[in-house]
Amino acid sequence: MRSLIYRQLLYNSYSVDLSDEITNIGAEKKENVTVQIGEFAQSQYAPVSWGSGETLSGNVEEQPLDGPYTPDKSNLPSNYWYLINPSNDGVVFSVTDNSTLWMFTYLVLPNTAQTSVVVNVMNETVNISIDNSGSAYKFVDYFKTSSAQAYRSRNFLITAHRLQAYKRDGDGNISNYWGSDAYGDLRVGTYFNPVPNAVINLNADFYVIPDSQQEMCTEYIRRGLPAIQTTTYVTPISYAVRSQRIARPNEDITISKASLWKEVQYNRDIVIRFVFANNIIKAGGLGYKWSEISYKANNYQYTYMRDGIEVVAHTTVSVNGVSVYDYNTGSLPTDFTIRNYDVLKESSFVYVDYWDDSQAFRNMVYVRSLNAELNQVQCVGGHYSFALPVGSWPVMQGGSVVLTFDGVTLSTQFTDYVSLNSLRFRFRCAVSEPPFRVTGTRISNLYGLPAANPMGDQQYYEASGRFSLISLVPSNDDYQTPIANSVTVRQDLERQLDEMRREFNELSANIALSQLIDLALLPLDMFSMFSGIRSTIEAAKNFATSVMKKFRKSNLAKSVNSLTDAITDAAGSISRSSTLRSANSAVSVWTDISDIVDSTDNVVTATATAAAKKFRVKEFTTEFNGVSFDDISAAVVKTKMNKLNVVDEEMLPQIITEASEKFIPNRAYRLIDGDKVYEVTTEGKYFAYLTETFEEVMFDAERFAELVTYSPVISAIIDFKTIKNLNDNYGITREQALNMLRSDPKVLRSFINQNNPIIKNRIEQLILQCRI
């Protein structure tokens, strides 16, 4: 592009420090995904790869292989694989309900000739025949269904690793492994004779494997156990909790102690409560459109009892990997539209940062052996009514997800007053019944939890569990370790941004049209609108650099190539989804910064893409300084910024970026070819008409594609429908029509001064769209 601002936006590159680069890398990873790290995040840097985050070695909820355990005779829990590793031949497994099933497994050693053996099993002496001529171990199942029957062999497993596994499902059916891996028929078989309450007797050392890890169990059968297998901590499965106990739920255990430091293990029962919060932003216009329904980080303080002691707790909830949906019924001002709304899905994660006033959190700096167990939480959405000016209100209702604990790490919560060392509990989302829908629309039977009303009728969601950690703390209990990297207390940027957005949008009605046109006559661009805020060139340069970093990752930086592809690919159908912004080529206050201009020119020459070279958007300039849509946007921003109470250097780049993405989303652009005008909109509509009569003619897509490469592209403040309506009702001269097509500000001002309702209404509608 030829204008300075777009050279800066699309091609400029400044030297930045490491934190800026990490922030930029993080921004590239959130394409079509809403990422809300939270008000009280662990650090200011976004993760390079979105996902569940770091998983520590001691944070697995269920260990894939837990054991070994000594032989056991009990009613073992269902839906777990019990992998036995016998050291001697003989009966290694038996089960009976004394009415419908008697079953046992006999291990036959390699190279055993056929012989008869007598075994004592389940209070019965049994004579069986065994043989194994091969070089591998053979597990043979013997089976009968009544006490009067004789045992007979049913199935067998041949394995080189002396391993067999058993599982009892929820119905009580027994499954184990049959066949041989050497012959390619290793498989899981099931005896459909339910024994749900029968005692299982394991006569060998065994390991416990969750049912979800069946493939791993099969690999152990085929290839043997790992070289080293030790139990590092209490596993959360029923058997281990019942048979072992490392510590009571709430106690402090001194592991080691020196003169200055000691290691203390903290075991705590905890109750985690959290409350989802959201942003619901209504777009401008007649009241039928919503621009955003999104999750936002939220903190919550509460108390609960632990061993008779009141605990004061503080949580902060945030989300990651949220899916973004939209709904659009049409382009009319009265068509119901939701541009973006967030939904928690299977790929989403919920983070809850937890802190309480107990001793465990006083010195949480040097920590090891961090473990936690939490129950599941089901979150069910409620109702949210979209209050339309006329007609029945659509209602978004339903939706549900189940949160399953997925890990725990250390974090730091930054509030406006204090920094808190915390534990960040990570929950994985799974969709559940019921689905959500919006009444009166096509949105129905979708699964997930939308952000419209994620709390439903709940005051808070609650998860109970416990955690354990070993912390290196001072030997003097009265001393508290300083929180690392917390030199100053960070003010809540998101809260300030919300206040600024709200104040910004409330000022829309206070801008006079005549004042707006006066401002639009100035050589405004997205930088010069802030010329009154920074008084020195150096400050202006730094501020411009900060804004540029924000812009480089926005949709605006990609819009030119997107429109080029759309025009090239569509033969007669113009459609595009991203926003193209025209630029004003007039010199602004920022052109005085010579080093920025020189750097920009060099970068443009070196890095301009082929598509950008072909699609050259030339600015249409006359002696009147033509007004463009960007001038309207810039004038609104400048006027509102002058009235805002809060102006912060960190927040302004964020506001500018949001303005570039969301200001005047319904745009029109036109090309003038002699007495013929081509006009396209960002909503995919296109038409051509004559300047003399405003009669619509056939849209020549090939001619338009040719013109758009070499001719000026004008932002149409007064679109074709408005000009035609003005001509039909008031009558305008050919010269006035041409000036309207060229967006001549003098003509616009004259119509506004005459209180022309058609032109005035058009400008007012543009201003109403200027919302963030």
Curated annotation (Swiss-Prot):
Give Gene Ontology CC terms. host cell endoplasmic reticulum-Golgi intermediate compartment; host cell plasma membrane; host cell rough endoplasmic reticulum; host cytoskeleton; membrane; viral outer capsid
Q: Which residues form a coiled coil?
A: 483-510
InterPro entries documented for this protein: ConA-like_dom_sf (IPR013320), Rota_A_VP4 (IPR042546), Rota_VP4_MID (IPR035330), Rota_VP4_MID_sf (IPR038017), VP4_concanavalin-like (IPR000416), VP4_helical (IPR035329)
Its BP terms in the Gene Ontology are: permeabilization of host organelle membrane involved in viral entry into host cell; virion attachment to host cell
Q: Where is this region: Spike head?
A: 65-225
What positions are marked as the site Probable cleavage?
A: R245, I246
Per the UniProt entry, the signal peptide is none
Region annotated Spike foot sits at 509-772
Q: Which domain of life is it from?
A: Viruses
Record's keyword terms, sorted:
Capsid protein, Coiled coil, Hemagglutinin, Host cell membrane, Host cytoplasm, Host cytoskeleton, Host endoplasmic reticulum, Host membrane, Host-virus interaction, Membrane, Outer capsid protein, Viral attachment to host cell, Viral penetration into host cytoplasm, Viral penetration via permeabilization of host membrane, Virion, Virus entry into host cell
Query: Where is motif YGL motif found?
Result: 447-449
For this protein, the record's Pfam families field holds:
Rota_VP4_MID, VP4_haemagglut, VP4_helical
Region annotation (Spike body and stalk (antigen domain)) maps to: 247-478
Record-marked site positions (Cleavage): T232, Y233, R242, S243
Question: Segment Hydrophobic: which positions?
Answer: 388-408
Membrane as UniProt keyword: yes
The answer to whether keyword Cell wall biogenesis/degradation applies is no
Q: What else is known?
A: In group A rotaviruses, VP4 defines the P serotype.
Family per similarity comment: Belongs to the rotavirus VP4 family.
Protein's name according to its UniProt entry: Outer capsid protein VP4
